[in-house]
A protein has these predicted regions:
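Extracellular glycan-recognition regions
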Residues: 1-171
Length: 171
């Protein structure tokens, strides 16, 4: 199947968890994966394009593109949407980031190959290509999947928010 998937995202890290490795993003995964993700580190917030071959067998994630992001103080009504008693206010967030994957498939029957080219945009109009097309491989039980994730390395249930405004699939 050939299709394009585009989504509008905003990353809202937990201000009490600075430098604790929060991650959230947009992913295509199967036995391997590629993702556009937001990451917090001791050096700030970054947008990264990553891929991982042999992910199901513990493969290493490679960072293919990285750019720093500025966090902007959110307005009060929006901040209150993400209010949690023990998290200091106000919240800060990235600007809106648009992510896109163009998936192309070729072949017939059991001999189909697919690839996904990832892009991002800061305005929803001009998209920047990220790396080379990613070879999409099916998962263990079903085909490859498109989705979102939000996680961090420490064990606590107060991670960042990934605000998904919308997702659109087109032919």
């Amino acid at each position: 199947e050939n299709f394009t998937v585009t989504s509008k995202l905003k990353f809202i890290p937990n201000p009490g968890n600075k430098n604790k490795g929060e991650e959230a993003g947009f992913i295509i995964k199967g036995q391997d994966y590629a993702a556009i993700k937001f990451v917090t580190t001791k050096d700030g917030c970054f947008l990264r394009y990553v891929n991982c071959k042999n992910a199901m067998k513990g493969g290493k994630e490679d960072v293919l593109h990285e750019m720093p992001l500025t966090l902007i103080e959110m307005e009060k009504p929006y901040t209150q949407k993400y209010a949690v008693d023990d998290i200091p206010q106000p919240r800060h967030a990235t600007q809106d980031i648009y992510v896109r994957a163009v998936v192309k498939s070729a072949g017939i029957c059991n001999n189909i190959t697919s690839s996904a080219q990832f892009y991002y945009s800061l305005d929803g109009k001009k998209y920047v290509k990220l790396g080379q097309p990613f070879a999409v491989k099916e998962g263990k039980w079903i085909g490859a999947k498109v989705g979102y994730f939000n996680c961090r390395s420490s064990v606590s249930n107060d991670a960042a928010f990934l605000d998904v405004d919308w997702i659109k699939f087109t032919k």
